């Protein structure tokens, strides 16, 4: 039996996932971070992307997070994000529309703040679509 840790994924709306896992992979600012039980404690900001949770004997679970914070303790992983959604619940049409709107705003280039906001919105939309694509491929 593999060692496990407790994982909590929490959004502004409430708890999205709480359970035991062998491995968590999250989108850290410097790249993907893989966490197993007894990992050294640390805090890391997250960028928009896919969080994968692998539990023994179960299919991996996939979630989209809009960024946030990752806290790691030896037997506890907590992910706090403004938005967290199970991959299977992502609204593909809404994500495609958000991507299109962000691309239009980037093409406009009317102001620095609007450009930065459009870049962030585009990154979130692309991350949602990539999470959904990975889920559908069974990569979760």
Swiss-Prot record:
Its main location: membrane. GO terms for cellular component: plasma membrane; proton-transporting ATP synthase complex. It is found in: Cell inner membrane. The keyword Iron does not apply. Disulfide bonds: none annotated. F-type ATPases have 2 components, CF(1) - the catalytic core - and CF(0) - the membrane proton channel. CF(1) has five subunits: alpha(3), beta(3), gamma(1), delta(1), epsilon(1). CF(0) has three main subunits: a, b and c. Belongs to the ATPase epsilon chain family. PANTHER family: ATP SYNTHASE DELTA/EPSILON CHAIN (PTHR13822), ATP SYNTHASE EPSILON CHAIN, CHLOROPLASTIC (PTHR13822:SF10). This is ATP synthase epsilon chain 1. It comes from Methylococcus capsulatus (strain ATCC 33009 / NCIMB 11132 / Bath). The lineage of its organism: Bacteria, Pseudomonadati, Pseudomonadota, Gammaproteobacteria, Methylococcales.
């Amino acid at each position: 039996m593999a060692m496990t840790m407790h994982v909590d994924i929490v959004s502004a709306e409430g708890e999205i996932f709480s359970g035991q896992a062998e491995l968590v992979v999250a989108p850290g600012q410097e790249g993907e971070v893989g966490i197993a039980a007894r990992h050294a404690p640390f805090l890391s900001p997250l960028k928009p992307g896919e969080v994968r949770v692998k539990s023994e004997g179960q299919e991996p679970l996939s979630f989209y997070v809009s960024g946030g914070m990752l806290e790691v303790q030896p037997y506890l992983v907590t992910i706090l994000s403004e938005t967290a959604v199970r991959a299977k619940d992502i609204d593909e049409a809404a994500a495609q529309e958000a991507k299109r709107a962000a691309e239009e705003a980037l093409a406009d280039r009317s102001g620095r703040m609007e450009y930065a906001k459009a870049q962030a919105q585009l990154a979130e939309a692309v991350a949602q679509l990539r999470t959904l694509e990975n889920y559908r491929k069974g990569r979760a």
